[in-house]
From Swiss-Prot:
GO terms for cellular component: cytosol. One of its GO terms (biological process) is gluconeogenesis. Pfam families: PGI. Belongs to the GPI family. Pathway: Carbohydrate biosynthesis; gluconeogenesis; Carbohydrate degradation; glycolysis; D-glyceraldehyde 3-phosphate and glycerone phosphate from D-glucose: step 2/4. It is found in: Cytoplasm. PROSITE patterns: P_GLUCOSE_ISOMERASE_1 (PS00765), P_GLUCOSE_ISOMERASE_2 (PS00174), P_GLUCOSE_ISOMERASE_3 (PS51463). The active site is at E356 (proton donor), H387, K502. GO terms for molecular function: carbohydrate derivative binding; glucose-6-phosphate isomerase activity; monosaccharide binding. Its EC number is 5.3.1.9. It catalyses: alpha-D-glucose 6-phosphate = beta-D-fructose 6-phosphate. It is an enzyme of class 5 (isomerase). This is Glucose-6-phosphate isomerase. The gene is pgi.
C-alpha cells in the first residue's frame, strides 16, 4: 500500500528536523568531492553534491525518508499510467514522450499512448524533411528559412530553453537548417519586433495552444494573420502549423492549416518540451538527429531515476536535499547559475517547472498544509551574475543554495589566449572559484571583507553541452520536482493558481468592473488614463 502522508507526519522527517547541517569548511576535501558524485543518466552527465551541507548521517535519513514516503513506488505509478493528477483526474505521461519504461498505458478510448506519441514523433520527422527538402513551400512559393513559435508558458519557456541550449552545437555540426524565434507575451511590441525582423515570405509559424483558446496566443495569432495579409499573403494558413489537443477549438473548428500536431491532456505545459510542443520547432531548426539525442538523454535519465538508492539517483537526492534546505534549514530560494551562455533561458524554464508545479498550499487531498512548499527559483549566467547579485549571495543576510551547471568544452570551439589562459579556462576557473568561495569563505578581521562561507551548492557538469546532455539535465529537474511534490504530498501536475487572474482580466476587458471599486479605479488609471 503506497503511503500518502503529509511531510510533517513522516517519522523520518521528524528525525531529519533534528539534524544540524554539515560544516563545509571542515569537510570539503578531494576525497569528498570524488565520492559525493552521481551520474544523472549512468554515463557522462554528473550531479556533484560535495558542497551541500550534508554527510553520511543525512544520507542515511534521506534513504529512510525516501523509503517511508514510497517515492520510487509513486514514480512507478506515473510510469504505469495511474491517474496521479487527482484534481483533474488525469494521467501524467511526459516520460512516455521519450520512451516506455513502465507498463503499456492505454487511454479510455483504447489508444496505446506510447504509440500515440511515437506516431506524432514520426509525423514531426516526416514534416521536417518535407520542409527541408523544399517540397513544402510558403504561400508565395518560397523555401522556408525561419520558424516562429507562438505560445505562452510551457508552450514557450521549455522549447526556448532547449532551442538556445542547442543552437550553437547544431551550427558547429552543420545541423542548423532554420532560424528559430518565439513570441509569447501579449504585449504587441513583441509580436511587431519579431515579425518586423524577418522575411515573412520565408517563415513558418507554429501556433501552440492546448485548449485552442489561450488569450495571449489567440491575440498574437490574430496579429500574425493581419501581418501576413498586409504583406499580400492571402492563403496565410499555408504558412501556419497548429499544435493543440485533438478535441480543441483549433482542431475542431479551424481547418486548412499546413499541418496539425497533437498534444495530450496528460502532459502539462511545463512538462511538455519533449512532446510536439518542443519537438516540432527543434526538428525543423536542427533535424531529427538532434531531437533523437535529446530524447535519448532524457529517457536514460528517466530510467536511472528509478534507482531506490539515494546515493545513485541524482534527482531523488536533489529533491531530498531541497526539502532539507527548505523545511529544516529554512532557505527560501534556490539560484540556478549556468556557466554557459547557451543556457541563458534554462533557469526561466525551471522557474515555471518548479514554482508552478509545487507552489501549492493544500495537499493532494485538498487539505491545507502547515509547512513550507516550493522555494523561489531564480538565476542567471556566469560570469555575468558575479558582477550583479553575487555580492548578496556571498555576504548578504540570507543563505541561498545554488545549482551550478558547467561544461569542460565550448560548443563552437573558438577561443582566444589572453594573460596566459584561454577564455574557456577562465570561465571554468571562475565556476570552481565560486563553489569554493561559497563553501569555505575567507576570514578577515575587517568585517566588511569577511566571507562566512557555508553557502551550499550543487554542481551539474559534463564534457560538453550536447543535445544528449541537455535532455539528461531536463529530465533531472523534471524528476527532482516530481519527487519534491511527492514528499510535500501535493499535486505537482495542476495549476489552479493561474486561473483567477485570467478570470479578472476577462471581466475587465468586458467592462464588467462596476461591482468592484478597486478594479474600477485601477481600470480608470491604467486602461482609460483618467
Amino acid at each position: 500500500m503506497i503511503n500518502y502522508k503529509n511531510l510533517n507526519e513522516l517519522e523520518n522527517f521528524k528525525i531529519l528536523e533534528r539534524i544540524d547541517p554539515e560544516v563545509l569548511k571542515t569537510v570539503l576535501t578531494g576525497k569528498r568531492i570524488k565520492e559525493y558524485d552521481i551520474t544523472i543518466e549512468g554515463d557522462s552527465v554528473h550531479y556533484n553534491y560535495a558542497s551541500k551541507q550534508i554527510n553520511e548521517n543525512h544520507l542515511k535519513i534521506f534513504q529512510n525518508l525516501s523509503d517511508e514516503a514510497n517515492l520510487i513506488e509513486k514514480y512507478k505509478e506515473i510510469l504505469n499510467g495511474e491517474r496521479v493528477n487527482i484534481s483533474e483526474n488525469r494521467k501524467v505521461l511526459h516520460h512516455l514522450t521519450r520512451g516506455q519504461i513502465g507498463k503499456d498505458v492505454i487511454e479510455d478510448n483504447k489508444e496505446n499512448m506510447r504509440e500515440f506519441f511515437q506516431s506524432e514523433l514520426e509525423k514531426i520527422y516526416n514534416f521536417a524533411k518535407q520542409i527541408h527538402s523544399g517540397n513544402i513551400k510558403s504561400a508565395n512559393g518560397k523555401k522556408f528559412k525561419n520558424v516562429v513559435q507562438i505560445g505562452i508558458g510551457g508552450s514557450s519557456l521549455g522549447p526556448k530553453a532547449l532551442y538556445s541550449s542547442i543552437k550553437n552545437y547544431a551550427k558547429k555540426h552543420n545541423l542548423a537548417l532554420m532560424n528559430g524565434y518565439f513570441i509569447s507575451n501579449i504585449d504587441p511590441d513583441e509580436s511587431a519586433e519579431v515579425l518586423n525582423s524577418i522575411n515573412i515570405d520565408e517563415t513558418l509559424f507554429i501556433i501552440v495552444s492546448k485548449s485552442g483558446n489561450t488569450l495571449e496566443t489567440k491575440a498574437n495569432m490574430q496579429f500574425l494573420i493581419n501581418k501576413l495579409k498586409s504583406n499580400g499573403i492571402k492563403e496565410y494558413k499555408k504558412q501556419m502549423v497548429i499544435i493543440t489537443l485533438k478535441n480543441s477549438m483549433l482542431a475542431l473548428e479551424e481547418k486548412g492549416y499546413l499541418e496539425y500536431f497533437f498534444m495530450h491532456d496528460s502532459i502539462g505545459g511545463r512538462f511538455s518540451p519533449t512532446s510536439a510542443v518542443g519537438l516540432v520547432l527543434l526538428a525543423l531548426c536542427f533535424t531529427e538527429k538532434i531531437v533523437k539525442e535529446i530524447l535519448k538523454g532524457a529517457n536514460k535519465a528517466d530510467k536511472k531515476s528509478l534507482n531506490k538508492n539515494v546515493k545513485d539517483n541524482a534527482p531523488l537526492l536533489a529533491a531530498l536535499i531541497s526539502i532539507y534546505e527548505r523545511n529544516v534549514l529554512n532557505y527560501s530560494s534556490n539560484c540556478i547559475i549556468a556557466y554557459s551562455k547557451a543556457m541563458e533561458n534554462f533557469y526561466l524554464h525551471l522557474q515555471q517547472l518548479e514554482m508552478e508545479s509545487n507552489g501549492k498550499s493544500v495537499n493532494r487531498f485538498n487539505e491545507t498544509i502547515n509547512y513550507k512548499t516550493v522555494r523561489i527559483i531564480w538565476g542567471g549566467i556566469g560570469t555575468d551574475v558575479q558582477h550583479s547579485f553575487f555580492q548578496m549571495l556571498h555576504q548578504g543576510t540570507d543563505i541561498v543554495p545554488m545549482d551550478f551547471i558547467g561544461f569542460n568544452e565550448t560548443q563552437l570551439k573558438e577561443d582566444v589566449i589572453s594573460d596566459n589562459s584561454s577564455s574557456n579556462d577562465k570561465l571554468k576557473a571562475n565556476l570552481i572559484a565560486q563553489i569554493i568561495a561559497f563553501s569555505k569563505g575567507k576570514e578577515n578581521s575587517n568585517k566588511n571583507k569577511n566571507f562566512k562561507g557555508e553557502r551550499p551548492s550543487a554542481l551539474i557538469y559534463s564534457k560538453e553541452l550536447t543535445p544528449y546532455a541537455i535532455g539528461s539535465i531536463l529530465s533531472h529537474y523534471e524528476n527532482k520536482v516530481m519527487f519534491e511534490g511527492f514528499l510535500l504530498n501535493i499535486n505537482s501536475f495542476d495549476q489552479e493558481g493561474v486561473q483567477l487572474g485570467k478570470t479578472l482580466a476577462n471581466q475587465i476587458l468586458k467592462n464588467d468592473t462596476f461591482e468592484d471599486e478597486a478594479i474600477e479605479s485601477y481600470s480608470k488609471k491604467i486602461l482609460k488614463q483618467d
